[in-house]
């Protein structure tokens, strides 16, 4: 009976699809519900005009909400088998476990160390195309830095350090014991720092699942649980804890402690550099300050309880800073300012939520504080495509501009330049030594006043093409690697779709010619030289760097769509941001700490009280510090129209 009503509607939609929708999406739309097909038609129509980011803020948010809904329905793919039924009681684990287990009561292992990377797009077998075109040719001709291009005043080196700090919290692939060797073809060998290099394959693991038969394990915990500070297992956690008053280890001078081999004692130290170490130090100080505040509020709390509550609070502070401070600077538009704040506070805003609590659904009050977590029927993980779009090494400069913080501030609170320190002196074990000489305060101010690199073609740091990689414990390996070439190879090896199929999978209109990707004539010429006329062969990393950017965005729109989906998922799927975001779990003082922290500046102010007053002129600690602060806009944000 119901089919009498629905069949004519489906026929009508089918005709609309054939006439109005890009042919590449006909099959995808045919598998959608009637409502979702209609929603896709709206999004696709706007995409064809390329105007969503120019819409008034409220309508831009509506577009993004519809697009996110579609991705939640069709771009969350489970890898591996899923247990059935309730597996654990949340009240037995009112804290973040060392290895990420027991967050999801229906799936003990979801988000744990060693769990599978998920997928946003079905894997595309590239075993026969691992060297087509050769990764070292791709890098030499299209990615390697010619001259340093920065982001102007929008994003600084703290911001570049922050995202690596987050990667060390979220993702790292398990390696196999088998090695692969790449050799530079003769046409580019003279321009490659390494003529050949060896590295370990990504370990391929059977999933026991009929659809996606093999997957890759994440050796970090993908929850937003601060594992960059605490580690992803009990062994590392025990090394960083003092087991006194809930605190973590740190020197009297405010530095991380070090092992005899020179490696830092911290949650995750693999392939690190002084910028990440500086942030790890800052958040060890934050954790310990939370412990002091909690103990002052309740002197009966024991070491274990203090640690557990302080970890919850510190992890939430990190997540909040990333959501409403870092990302807002990355995507510097009114629409994304409103959108990211809505993720945390909802459309009703901070003042309403602070006064009345979480009211209604996530649209009105945000994901944080929802009555129950939401994984959209797919166990929580971070995905292969997520790892791909976070390949952001062009953000790194060639040297750090060290500043004199003993001098008087210059114009816009700028400190004088002392010298430039090459990045090779700031990475790995040498970087730990250099940071001890510089000090955290001078390092923070110096990074704050220096613009980071732009995510564009010909801006991948040359010094990363001859890099000493680390073992998981932070010790150095003997074989150097060309990181740029390795990143191109890794996406192919892990069966991540190439750029055009990547876009199709995300319901984004694919390119049909190089001119659709970029207006840069030199780039078009070299793209043709490397890939010929076949746009389907374009590597996703190259496409993300080449793509025309939305005004205000430091990343490509393609990467942003993954952000749109996964940034929400990191909050809404985690019970410690939803059903357990309460005084009972965090304590009254702990919840107050999270709710009153709005930015990285707030954290810096707690541990370096004079620093921002003396040296920070900008509105955010993630934009260049001597920039003028944002001007107050009297127009309510939802009624603003982008310039």
Swiss-Prot record:
Cofactor: how and how many bound:
Binds 1 heme b (iron(II)-protoporphyrin IX) group per subunit. Binds 1 calcium ion per subunit.
Residues flagged as site, Transition state stabilizer: 270
Keyword Transmembrane helix in the entry? The reply is no
Please provide the record's keywords in A-Z order.
Answer: Calcium, Dioxygenase, Fatty acid biosynthesis, Fatty acid metabolism, Heme, Iron, Lipid biosynthesis, Lipid metabolism, Metal-binding, Oxidoreductase, Oxylipin biosynthesis, Peroxidase, Plant defense
Offer one example of a GO biological process linked to this entry.
response to oxidative stress
- An annotated Gene Ontology molecular function: peroxidase activity
Q: Which reaction does it catalyse?
A: hexadecanoate + O2 = (2R)-2-hydroperoxyhexadecanoate; dodecanoate + O2 = (2R)-2-hydroperoxydodecanoate
Enzyme kind, highest EC tier: oxidoreductase
What is this enzyme's EC?
Answer: 1.13.11.92
What job does this protein perform? Alpha-dioxygenase that catalyzes the primary oxygenation step of a variety of 14-20 carbon fatty acids, containing up to three unsaturated bonds, into their corresponding 2R-hydroperoxides. Involved in the production of oxylipins that function in cell signaling, wound healing, and protection from infection. The alpha-oxidation pathway of fatty acids may play a role during plant developmental processes.
Q: For binding heme b, which residues are annotated in this chain's numbering? A: 173, 393, 490, 494
Record-given protein name: Alpha-dioxygenase PIOX
Q: Which PROSITE patterns match?
A: PEROXIDASE_3
